[in-house]
């Protein structure tokens, strides 16, 4: 029997096709698609609302407007399916065909397609070798073009004006062919032979060496090749038939009052039809040529406007003065088809409402309002009611639900039970912005959210809204439960630290209860165990804050009652600790066991033998963990757990060899030490982290929930509140301010005497006040801390809130009770005068005014930056969206070398933090004992960290995404650990999107930060000295030093250098980088203590130091030309500054130092002369003929004034790095190792020539340095490749060319990390590496060899290697390419998938280029698949794709 379903067309399975091809359509093809020609501009009859025949909505062409009903009403119902009505000609069929059927308009005269004309580079122009201007003159009927000159002396494709054409006709008659308009262009395109043209262009390319010409030829060749390969004929770019969109995609809706709402496209089509009909009529009437030409031009313009309004001439506007939306506009931009409808669909089974807090929920639950659940789960309820026999039809079920009888609510409870729902809070910046929960039905109209997931959602309860979505299919429910349930997402994917961490009130509660107060009831009592403490506390014998002693797990601890109460809620398990040795051969295992039985120490054997020798392999493990980790049988595990403490096991066979175990002892999974301290935010985070690492997921979730409960309980009992007395102003505040004012006055005097410049004064003053503010803040914290233990036993609540990390920050407290400090102007500069008052004392009018300045900036910043940050995230997601883990191991032999991130002598990130969770490339060995710490190919995990740190390793080779050899995607070994779960990454994980989210999410958070501090300037006090961090001896090494008049050593290395500190064993323990001009206050070999000052410098100027003694002589320093004497209006003192005013190019301001014989002195190295070129902006500190000593400063260069360092400076910097833009003041880097020589004379343009001559006598490199730039090197210096000749930010392309692509990648990773580090945000390196890998996927062709490539073409690295492999196999010459780095926007647009690129940016250009090349999109990325409506090839969709491929 047929079912109703059989009558309908079945939807095609979206996996049935393997790709999407796009190409330019010919007129024949458009006619094939069409269901009829539209000849009338009418739309619908306004009285009957029926479509007019042959009009834009014609039912005969497009199908009926009502299901199975013809236009005149003769045939109705489904029984006439497929009949065509003889009266009105309409087929009886579903009305939805009006969404699919196209029509066409036959044009009376061909027109050009504006995309192929105007989208740069112009496709028509490049095929014909005409400029856009020339083409437009022909197409818009301004000039004739010669098609075939035959025997005349006209040249082919020559443009003729109206007069010239008439003259030529008069002169030659019909001996030549010329035409005007699109017909002419079509005739020319028809004549083009692509094969011949392509060959000719390739020959021309080989023959020319002019760069501009080569570029132009390559561009033409690219377009001609695309046409040739795809089989698209260039003449199809001229349209003879315009396709018409199906009518339901450009609807016309009647409104009340007889008006209509219509899509703009209808107006645009109407204009085309009207003009086309008028042109037909004029041609039939044989109207004068000039009228017909005008009408043809108007038709061309009408079609242009239909395709892309505003591209040519002024945009056509509708009745309400806004431009009409053309076909291009419906695709483009955020509101276009791609982003609005294909990537951002709205979904059913969803709802949204306000959120409130649900403090009594468990972590996997959320409170769902009953009314909402009833609406969302309706179909399920109908089904369940029917099942239970309450109703028999859906209709009666509907009625029953509408009446809301009690049975309905019971049914709802059953349906909702254990059915996961997804909650989402916009903006969803990372994957934790959508999580699944089990709903608990509640009264009221707000969703209740568990407080611990607020961090992940970035939610608060000041009116935020959240959306609920219901996973419908069983698969979706499983995924929601297994992958998305809140309890399965405890760690942050960005850095692996827990993200489900108690905050705010909970922290306040735990902090309050774990603090001790002297003199509390029951102080000093000793208890035998935690149970006793709890009993005593319950009976009121001891107070919460009493300091007591307790025996826990056999050890006596000094602790407090509150801490024992916290310890009691922690899920505890006592587990055995095993030491173990792994052997691959049984023989070796037997001999070791025999030795141990003879009395040898197990630890010694562990270090000597086994595959992991050198690792003190000791683990506390549960039985099930032992079974899974070592591959033991149940029986073996039981045997091990029956051992006595200190006993050694027999040899146990496991999956990959043999093991010996020794039971070393027992311990609780979470040691009491973790709780035995005041539990602030940081301590609690460590506790949760430790719980996750040691006890696994389940216990951690229980712990988090219990901490939440106890935290809320005690923050309520503690009842902390703020009073004005709690804001203690430190007594020393005014002393510190007076001292600072005195220093500022000194600096003002120095400035008045002309010793320092305006810029230096500003910098120093800002520095003094920054330091004073910090000092006051520290004093204030101390004052409040001591206040916390006052005899009355009261805590200082403000201090507690900040110290525990529950609310507010040290910064905000400083403003309340310290001093507000320096404020920033909107430009980012810092105002010199600080606000010395705080909020408790109150601000004066002036102070208040200054502070509003900065606060407003904060607000404006926030608004602007959020958009910027969102855009950065979008570009990142786009470039990395097809990065998926596709295989286990790509077999790469390469990796990257990682060292600790050091800035200015400070370790910003330790080596172990950078390598954790990565795979070792080769064996990591202890540099002293040569023992293996980690085997090559093994993951560097937590247990290796202390060993690596103690071994003194400074560099480690690891596998990296940057060197992964996988053809598509990335392999698991090169990626390493998946931070969200703490184990090796799984196949199909979309690591690209993960990386984009991890980098983009903090960006948005950081922009919000200025908003909360309220405009006070945050600035690090500039470092001006190096202090030793450890005891040891100084080794100055190969620093170039000169002793100055004060007998101190001055560093003369122009590019800076470093000295080291070694410990007693001669091991290097610290590196101290110093800058040029720094004075070193210690001697070589001197014994130093931690905290000693080793070197100092002026942080605000770069000095120029004389290396020899003698007499000063000026060269080319002429007042008014190269030197300006400025009298300071404030001080009346004059200073001499080098300027660049002279119009002649051959002046080089310099200072020479003459010896006693009045010759230029020779430097200590005996080669170079003592000449010092002076850059623009240098301030002279000596006069001519002064006598100076070695080490004296002769001139100084002020550094830029400091602006506030915040993410505002940071986000644009991150964007600049990811877009690989050339920095404004780019550094000039040496490309080779060699010796410097600086030419005396300058070039014609006044540039200075610096030559680097290689040691081995190869080709020297020359660099032209612009006038007035400070050269970082001296004549005769040795310089390494990649070092700076002129300082500045490095241009990424230079770094790549000189030091290679891996070095560049490391450079980008470190630079991006620096920005985020400043803000205290941790992102793992691998996320940035994934993005950088995507930016480096292209190769620029340098030599084409025997391949099809074109010079300077950018091709995908994979395609490049494949093509070369083929060419070599056929005995040809491969192409040569150089690695290329593209910015993220360029890289996204250069992806192989045109669907992805078109939905990103420049839609028109991408589609135009793809359609002439006949590109196929094989749907490998995520975005293409979402747009095509398929499952994404990642995660659970990944395996399915693999299966499909294998079939």
Curated annotation (Swiss-Prot):
What GO biological process terms are annotated to this protein in UniProt?
DNA-templated transcription
Instruction: Name the UniProt key words of this record, in alphabetical order.
Output: DNA-directed RNA polymerase, Magnesium, Metal-binding, Nucleotidyltransferase, Transcription, Transferase, Zinc
Q: Name one GO cellular component term.
A: DNA-directed RNA polymerase complex
What chemistry does it catalyse, as a reaction equation? RNA(n) + a ribonucleoside 5'-triphosphate = RNA(n+1) + diphosphate
Cofactor: bound how, per the entry note? Binds 1 Mg(2+) ion per subunit.
User: Per UniProt, where does Zn(2+) 2 bind?
Assistant: 890, 964, 971, 974
InterPro entries in alphabetical order:
DNA-dir_RpoC_beta_prime, DNA-dir_RpoC_beta_prime_bact, PPIase_dom_sf, RNA_pol_asu, RNA_pol_N, RNA_pol_Rpb1_1, RNA_pol_Rpb1_3, RNA_pol_Rpb1_3_sf
Q: Does the keyword Ribonucleoprotein apply?
A: no
Instruction: Name the protein family.
Output: Belongs to the RNA polymerase beta' chain family.
Q: What the protein does?
A: DNA-dependent RNA polymerase catalyzes the transcription of DNA into RNA using the four ribonucleoside triphosphates as substrates.
A GO MF term: magnesium ion binding
Q: Which cofactor does it need?
A: Mg(2+); Zn(2+)
**Quaternary organization:** The RNAP catalytic core consists of 2 alpha, 1 beta, 1 beta' and 1 omega subunit. When a sigma factor is associated with the core the holoenzyme is formed, which can initiate transcription.
- Its EC number(s): 2.7.7.6
List residues binding Mg(2+).
460, 462, 464
**A Pfam family per the record:** RNA_pol_Rpb1_4
- Give the protein name, as stated in the record: DNA-directed RNA polymerase subunit beta'
Q: At which positions is Zn(2+) 1 bound?
A: 70, 72, 85, 88
